[in-house]
């Protein structure tokens, strides 16, 4: 009795692209494309194959071509995605665990004897990374976010309706105005949920921001949750929109010292991405908090922080 990992490595994907390039002479950056494909699929064979086929059909072997393929793939009604989502109906405990992992950032220790964790691994939703349960890949991760958020949309939640009314306010000359998005979100969140208890905010804040953001970028932009920073205290949302990239850190306020440390970490993270500007969305339960937008510079990086 043994398990066989069928996923492709970065080198394995690169080898496939090397052969393709030899035959088709596209001029692609093979190493870069292999890395991007792996980042989104973690080497899941079907996802690698499907994305490559979609890119091949368009002849756009670039990062933008890949992002377009990812966006289209996530709107497909294929047998793999149908099967995955069907498992959520069949196993309510599995659905609840995945919600806690995705929206609440709940750390889950990998335990092969836990039946729910075992199901999540077997169906391909998650994997074991250094003893922690993490999403198996960005594609499945975003598929789940989209599924859960779409259920909220069908429920006609007020934040979703606010986003639909606002969605045409945020694109200027082809550029996404992320600061303006945060300003409007803070206003709506305070009006709709300002009197809710702390437990509600802590569990629901990030979910409501994604619910507000998704209709704004839908059809044009991509988003994913950065696996390296997913935790109870912090979640980084990465948005790609018409060639521009945005990093939005959502976090729970834990005091000034924690907040300053978080800003330094975000500045370092922006350096990794080659970005000058980053965004923070802080859910603060202090009754004397100052709601709104402020701008600071940390380690040469411009940080725009929204506080609700």
Task: Describe the role of every protein-language-model region.
Residues 2, 9-123, 129, 159-163, ...:
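Winged-helix-like regulatory helical subdomains adjacent to P-loop NTPase cores
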Residues 132-137:
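Minor-groove-contacting beta-hairpin "wing" of winged helix-turn-helix DNA-binding domains
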